[in-house]
Amino acid sequence: GIIYPSDFIPLFERNGKICKLDLYVFTEVCRLISHWEKNGKEAVPVSVNLSRQHFTDEDFLEQFADIAQQYHIPAGMIEFELTESIFFENHQINRVGDAIKRMHELGFACSLDDFGSGFSSLGLLKEFDVDSIKLDRSFFLNMSGQKARDVIACLVDLAKRLKVKTVAEGIEDWGTVEYLRSIGCNMVQGYVFAGPL
């Protein structure tokens, strides 16, 4: 049967294999982008998750850069998704900031995933130079009230002021898509278009 990430990722984090898994996924993404481009297909930017365990090694990004170079991946084609949990380890805060700068130097984008699911999201936006925020699906579960819509509109407006793109996660209906379009949300993902690939 299907094994979901919520089942196997904690196991890989406990047994120390999560960094190898991230590198494997990254390599496969690079291979696919290269394959698409060689076959005349337009490649689209792809987001990959990055475990907080990578941040214990100051030079971890060089390995990712070497793989991207091996596959001739153009700058801007790969975005690293960071979750709020990466920022909770106080001794790693400086490393995370330095790593985000290095990501940009190497041609990678960086997003803050599941934005709004924790308590420190706004503070993170102030401190770290991310390219986009991915608004957590919990924002969109009950949008019948004006207050919920106002919160989302304020977040999108704040992101625009900071020159950060917004991505709405977990969208399941066209009414929400139209609302997000009307307030200027940059991108939408969810079952309204397709299931996970």
What are these regions (language model features)?
Residues 16-95, 170:
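Catalytic core of bacterial c-di-GMP phosphodiesterases, primarily the EAL and HD-GYP domains
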Residues 1, 51-58, 70, 77-91, ...:
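EAL-family c-di-GMP phosphodiesterase catalytic domain
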Residues 5, 93-99, 121:
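Short beta-alpha junctions and helix-cap segments that line functional grooves
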Residues 1-3, 35:
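Short helix-loop capping/hinge motifs at secondary-structure junctions, enriched
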Residues 8:
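Conserved, function-defining core regions and hallmark residues within catalytic/recognition domains
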Residues 31, 62-66, 95-105, 150-157:
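Alpha-helical scaffolding segments of alpha/beta enzyme cores, especially the outer helices
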